[in-house]
A protein has these predicted regions:
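The feature encodes the CheY-like receiver
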Residues: 18, 60, 84
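Charged docking surfaces used in two-component/phosphorelay signaling
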Residues: 19-27
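Short amphipathic alpha-helix used as the core "switch/output" element in two-component signaling
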Residues: 43, 65-77
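The short loop immediately C-terminal to the conserved phospho-acceptor aspartate in CheY-like receiver
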Residues: 53, 57-58
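C-terminal output helix
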Residues: 108-118
Length: 129
């Protein structure tokens, strides 16, 4: 993990989510790549290690649970944050069981995403917010 700009992936099949979240995180100094295609994102995590991944759960193509499992398998230190419009207690429990850092229900405020990503970054850097 680098000590300067942390590398973040945003994956959501709704383009508006990526369009809003990417600049909000870049403004905080993160290096951000966003994807609306889960297959393209899965290919990308095979070649690049991300510090933090923000992913939707319900997507066309590769399901978010499957994606986060593969991401954690490839890079156990990667912190995964789940965003979903289908938030249930069962889904949240399953996400945490699979190593998710945090779980955010849609609709969300950009400040919520920024706060959770900052907390994940602090954990990676060994500091607190």
């Amino acid at each position: 993990m680098s000590t300067d700009k942390l590398k973040v992936m945003v994956l959501d099949d709704e383009p508006i989510v990526c369009k809003r979240v990417q600049p909000a995180l870049e403004k905080l100094g993160y290096e951000v790549e966003s994807y609306t295609d889960s297959h393209a994102a899965m290919h990308r995590i095979q070649e690049t290690e991300y510090d933090i991944i923000v992913t939707d759960l319900k997507m066309k193509g590769i399901d978010g649970m499957q994606f986060l499992q593969e991401a954690k398998k490839r890079s156990p230190r990667t912190e995964v944050i789940v965003i979903t419009g289908f938030a249930t207690l069962e889904t949240a429990k399953e996400s945490f069981h699979k190593g998710v850092f945090d779980f955010i229900a849609k609709p969300f405020k950009l400040s919520e995403i920024q706060e959770v990503v900052n907390k994940a970054a602090a954990k990676l850097r060994g500091t607190t917010t």
